[in-house]
C-alpha cells in the first residue's frame, strides 16, 4: 500500500474513495489481527500510516458533502 497524499485523494470520485477506504480498512484489520496473535509486524510504522490514511479519506469525503 503506497502512501496516499491528500491531493491524490481529492482527485478520486466518491465510489473510488469508498473502495479505497474498504481496502485500507481490510489491510488495517489484517495488521491488527497479526499483532494481536503475537506476530511481529513486517513494518512497524504501517499501522500508524494506515490509520492516518483512513482519517484523510474520511475527512475529504466529509469535505465533499
Curated annotation (Swiss-Prot):
Name of one Pfam family that matches: Ribosomal_L29
Signal peptide interval: none
InterPro entries, A to Z: Ribosomal_uL29 (IPR001854), Ribosomal_uL29_CS (IPR018254), Ribosomal_uL29_sf (IPR036049)
PROSITE patterns: RIBOSOMAL_L29 (PS00579)
One cellular component term from this protein's GO annotations in UniProt: ribonucleoprotein complex
SUPFAM superfamilies in alphabetical order: Ribosomal protein L29 (L29p)
Keywords: Ribonucleoprotein, Ribosomal protein
Keyword presence, Ribosomal protein: yes
GO molecular function, one term: structural constituent of ribosome
A GO biological-process term: translation
Domain of life: Archaea
Similarity remark: Belongs to the universal ribosomal protein uL29 family.
Protein's name in the database: Large ribosomal subunit protein uL29
The species this protein was found in: Methanococcus aeolicus (strain ATCC BAA-1280 / DSM 17508 / OCM 812 / Nankai-3)
Amino acid at each position: 500500500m503506497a502512501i496516499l497524499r491528500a491531493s491524490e485523494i481529492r482527485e478520486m470520485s466518491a465510489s473510488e474513495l469508498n473502495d479505497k477506504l474498504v481496502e485500507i480498512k481490510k489491510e488495517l484489520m489484517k495488521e491488527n489481527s497479526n499483532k494481536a496473535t503475537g506476530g511481529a509486524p513486517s513494518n512497524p510504522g504501517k499501522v500508524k500510516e494506515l490509520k492516518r490514511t483512513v482519517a484523510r479519506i474520511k475527512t475529504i469525503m466529509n469535505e465533499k458533502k
